Amino acid sequence: MSNPGFLLSIASVGLVLAATPVMAQTKPAGADVPAAPSTPAQSSLVVGALQIGSAPNLVVAGVDISVASDSIVYSYFFKNTGSAELDVAASVSLPELQASADRSETWALAANDPENPVGLTITAAGTPVTTQAEVHANALGIDRRTEIKAEHLPLIPFGAELDKAVAALSPDAADRLAALGVVSPRDPAQPKAPVMADWSLDVVRSWRQVLPPGKTTPIVVKFSPVKAQYALAKGDQEDLDDMKDEICLKPVVLSALQSRLKGSGAWKVTDISIAADLPSHWIDSSRPTLSVQKPKPDMIVAFCGMDEKTASRPTVLGAAPDDADEVRIVIFEPAAK
């Protein structure tokens, strides 16, 4: 849900505010290496919303989403209006992981775990839920986990561990994997240049959910967001104009953000996109409600569907717009020049 045009000019500021991520891919430094296309040093990805099977007596009583800079919590309330328990399938899709072709983007993951890189936890009525991982490492549409593991490559297709492993590939192994579409081909003109992972890692966590009769069961899904972090400084006023519609910036807020930049101030920006899909296509449900925690009182929060009356409070409230399957939430923190 990122805005490529906006992010293009952000990175030219040259300020990277994010701490070193657990797992990341970055462009290697070097005086003779041309600058990568301008993109944020740390980009965002969306974790899928919970999806659940249907049953005649299953009602979605509500969905609440709580957002903090380091944690997102979805609370689903499922009511079984019947006299017998329901047993339905449920799943959460984790974000697709794929290397940046030009090494210009990086993603901060909560854990170096290919089956759960976002630290996902799920509870039902307060009891931890055990999920099963459906994992695919797809190259040219074919699951190549066997070939990847045979060459001792990690499944996460970027990061320091991956870079070290592909650098250790023999020329024959690299050529064999390239022929399968698993890694990039070697460049004969630059035989020492490292190859890159060319597969995507797709993970779905699934389970069977039992819902007792006549009760409402809360299911809580919690994880660490894969967020973008960057800076805005003097000269970036037009970039705020470019993003105003996507996050529904009001004129007075836009003016305040731009005024700081005109006065040689800066903004540290945390940019998070969340899924706002309803849990079932076949069960009516109201739109998810949103609450966004401000890490500090002087920060500005912006997103479409925000309740403007809560903008100055420690917790900003709102609801996902009717036509949105994702909501982009941006938190602006005042920063020195």
Question: Which residue stretches match the model-derived regions?
Answer:
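Bacterial N-terminal signal peptides that target proteins for export
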Residues: 1-11
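Bacterial N-terminal signal peptides
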Residues: 9-19
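Lumenal/extracellular ectodomains and adaptor appendage modules
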Residues: 24-337
